[in-house]
């Protein structure tokens, strides 16, 4: 599934249109217990290149491309280079890329590829800063991994945003307060807040059966 949205600045002025491209579970070596991207985005049987051509082909207006639905940092460098090569025919209209990802694994070659290909903004997912809950969610990273990635990427001049969730199993109000305090301290460009949704055919769903 592909859709279009526009970014709006804090003065309410419409800026560049963002064209999201969904990459279900790309780079996810460990799947979070609540996640089933097939349900969230729909799985298009056509090749990724065909989907990109469909949404960008014939377009004249400038746009930004968002890469969502997977863990970009977990994609092997060769495959990441190949992914960006699919957008080469549209460099005349693409003004940059944004993406969402876990904070790990953060490799030097991955950072280099993202910089060379015009990635401007990275949304780092951190459902909670409680390491016990992160482990129960099968996130395969810790809160300290998020801090390290945020510092490294900020030093590389990427714009940074954060995503967190509420309603997690075992979560307390103290956990939520800790998350808010950490995000205020980190000062991301913006924050996305997601409620936990229990989807069929996920480990989380089976816990509720």
Task: Please tell me what each predicted stretch does.
Residues 2-41, 57-73, 98-102, 120-121, ...:
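N-terminal pre-triad scaffold of radical SAM enzymes
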Residues 4-6, 54, 107-109:
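Short alpha-helical segments and helix-capping/turn motifs at coil-helix boundaries
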Residues 4-6, 172, 202:
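Secondary-structure junction/capping motif
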Residues 30-32, 199-206:
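Short acidic/His/Gly/Ser-rich catalytic and metal-binding motifs that mark active-site loops
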Residues 40-50, 69-190, 204-209:
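Conserved non-cysteine loop/helix-boundary elements of the Radical SAM core domain that shape
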Residues 49-59:
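Short microdomains enriched in Cys/His and/or Lys/Arg
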Residues 196:
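Short, ordered loop/turn segments at secondary-structure junctions
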């Amino acid at each position: 599934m592909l859709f279009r949205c526009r970014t709006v600045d804090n003065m309410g002025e419409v800026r560049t249109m963002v064209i999201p491209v969904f990459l279900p579970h790309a780079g996810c070596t460990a799947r979070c217990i609540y996640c089933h991207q097939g349900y969230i985005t729909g799985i298009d049987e056509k090749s990724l290149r065909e989907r990109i051509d469909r949404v960008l082909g014939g377009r004249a207006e400038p746009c930004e491309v968002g890469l969502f639905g997977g863990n970009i940092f977990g994609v092997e460098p060769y495959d990441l280079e190949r992914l960006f090569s699919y957008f080469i025919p549209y460099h005349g209209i693409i003004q940059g890329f944004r993406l969402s990802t876990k904070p790990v694994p953060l490799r030097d070659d991955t950072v280099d590829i993202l910089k060379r290909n015009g990635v401007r903004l990275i949304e780092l997912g951190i459902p909670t800063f409680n390491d016990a809950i992160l482990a129960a969610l099968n996130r395969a990273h810790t809160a300290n991994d998020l801090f390290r990635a945020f510092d490294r990427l900020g030093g590389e001049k990427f714009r940074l945003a954060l995503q967190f969730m509420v309603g997690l199993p075992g979560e307390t109000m103290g956990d939520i307060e800790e998350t808010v305090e950490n995000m205020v301290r980190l000062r991301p460009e913006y924050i996305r807040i997601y409620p936990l949704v229990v989807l069929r055919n996920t480990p989380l769903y089976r816990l509720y059966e």
